[in-house]
From Swiss-Prot:
The organism's taxonomic lineage, starting at the top: Bacteria, Pseudomonadati, Campylobacterota, Epsilonproteobacteria, Campylobacterales
Protein name, as recorded: Small ribosomal subunit protein bS6
Family: Belongs to the bacterial ribosomal protein bS6 family.
The organism's place on the tree of life at top rank: Bacteria
Gene: rpsF
Annotated keywords: Ribonucleoprotein, Ribosomal protein, RNA-binding, rRNA-binding
């Protein structure tokens, strides 16, 4: 089995149930063809770098998996025929150095919660807002 990473972007117009259904479908494609999903990242709704099919946002999903090369053609075919997939990519890790990098990515993905960045930003925003209030109170007492 070879090491792979896949990422796909779904249309932002899909409801939550449809998104979950699409993600499960592609996970099943990998596992039905004797692939093993090591880890995945549900990156959620994000802005696109440029407009794709009149959409400015998309739902990102990444999976790191091991599979036989013959399965990749079927996975890519299924991405292409699904109108809800805006973009996709499948990356193959071949050399020893690339496989080590793949393992590092898997380890990092397993340690980091999928929405940790959003939680961190909310915490920073709350903290900076609190600091501004404290500074304004202090300046009135002078």
């Amino acid at each position: 089995m070879r090491h792979y990473e896949t990422m796909f972007i779904l249309k932002p117009t899909l409801v939550e149930e449809e998104i979950k259904s699409k993600i499960e479908f592609y996970k099943e494609v990998i596992t039905k063809h004797h692939g093993v999903i090591e880890t995945s990242l549900d990156m959620g709704m994000r802005n696109l770098a440029y407009e794709i099919k009149k959409h400015k946002r998309g739902y990102y999903y990444v999976a790191y998996f091991k599979a036989n090369p013959s399965m990749i053609l079927e996975l890519e075919r299924l991405y292409r025929i699904n109108e809800d997939v805006l973009r996709f990519i499948v990356i193959k890790y071949e050399s020893k150095k690339e496989v080590e990098a793949w393992h590092a990515l898997v380890d990092r993905a397993n340690k980091k919660p999928s929405h940790a960045k959003e939680k961190h930003e909310k915490t920073e925003h709350t903290h900076s807002h609190h600091t501004e209030e404290t500074e304004s109170v202090g300046s009135h007492s002078k």
